[in-house]
Amino acid sequence: MRRFNWVLRHVQARRTFDSAIGLRQGSQKPLFERYIHATGINNSSARNYYDVLGVSPKATREEIKKSFHELAKKFHPDTNRNNPSAKRKFQEIREAYETLGNSERREEYDKLQYRNSDYVNNDGGDSERFRRAYQSNFSDTFHKIFSEIFENNQIKPDIRVELSLSLSEAAEGCTKRLSFDAYVFCDSCDGLGHPSDAAMSICPTCRGVGRVTIPPFTASCQTCKGTGHIIKEYCMSCRGSGIVEGTKTAELVIPGGVESEATITIVGAGNVSSRTSQPGNLYIKLKVANDSTFTRDGSDIYVDANISFTQAILGGKVVVPTLSGKIQLDIPKGTQPDQLLVLRGKGLPKQGFFVDHGDQYVRFRVNFPTEVNERQRAILEEFAKEEINNELSDSAEGSWLYQKLSTG
């Protein structure tokens, strides 16, 4: 029997300890925790939580959340400075939502309400014990609820942006100054979340120790998060988070030869989350625009050169653009349409190769006239006859009869 009583005492102590330090399965802490003091739970909160939020006991979680947001904005002390009762009303609304907005707590609360309706002589002690059981968690979740009102969602530390480059910028390399939206430390409070001269008071839960002990267990106090004190004020600019939306700038040195979709990383240039953690990174995805003159294929480029059909036959000269300027090329005699001429090393820089540049390919586009004058026509007809004679001669020279006749 002694052994049983000893086990029972320790089980009860463990349950009491868990309630005191706020251990709840599935609980998640908000990204920015500022341990803002909230007045203790008022006895007026004995009202039914569903009535406080103006919803039905069968209301969905979304309906409860929507009603809470509307009421919280309406009765928030910041917008009701001349209405002392608004603070009590806001606290009542917050307490109701902290219970009904959590599925586990709501289930326990509903069971309690059912019991109270069954036993007429219930003295209300169950309701008060329910509040005390969760009171240590109310301060812990206050910032999360406060953030929901003002839509201060969790911040992802890394930032991803895109930067457009022209082909010439990608080929030669350049320096770019980039501005982008980011979360930065609040200037008003220097990222503290509260005024630098904000008054502090001893934590009522741990009485300044920072730890809660219920033999044989000891753990960090969940009300003050181990600091031993709580702050009664919060920064109005950042609403206690220490973080605000702002703009950052970064200078980016882009090497020559970068390709589209390449990503450049700047460590520590992303969003800030707290003064005790490192900022996220900035990831810049490059987008190289298509060029009206050149077509790119890796480190090689292609350009078209328009020539006449007489230049294609007789040869000649043509001026073509390159990345470093225009140059004059010799057109080989007998150039065929779409024939390529290679200019070695005239392409884009290569990264990490022994050959430091790609090539430029000149594609000859042969233009044929749609109209000719009489003289040109006569010349072309004569040329055509000559072609036919040459073809017949070539054909005859290759025949068995021609070979016999020529050898006599």
UniProtKB/Swiss-Prot annotation:
Its main location: mitochondrion. Pfam families: DnaJ (PF00226), DnaJ_C (PF01556), DnaJ_CXXCXGXG (PF00684). A zinc finger (CR-type) spans 173-247. Residues 1-26 form a transit peptide. Coiled coil: none annotated. It comes from the Eukaryota. One of its GO terms (cellular component) is mitochondrion. Residues 48-113 form the J domain. Ubiquitous. It is found in: Mitochondrion. Its cofactor is Zn(2+). Zn(2+) 2 binds at C203, C206, C221, C224. GO terms for molecular function: ATP binding; heat shock protein binding; unfolded protein binding; zinc ion binding. One of its GO terms (biological process) is protein folding. CXXCXGXG motif repeats lie at residues 186-193, 203-210, 221-228, 235-242. Binds 2 Zn(2+) ions per monomer. Zn(2+) 1 binds at C186, C189, C235, C238. Homodimer. Belongs to the DnaJ family. B/II subfamily. PANTHER family: CHAPERONE PROTEIN DNAJ 1, MITOCHONDRIAL (PTHR43096:SF36), DNAJ HOMOLOG 1, MITOCHONDRIAL-RELATED (PTHR43096). Plays a continuous role in plant development probably in the structural organization of compartments. This is Chaperone protein dnaJ 1, mitochondrial.
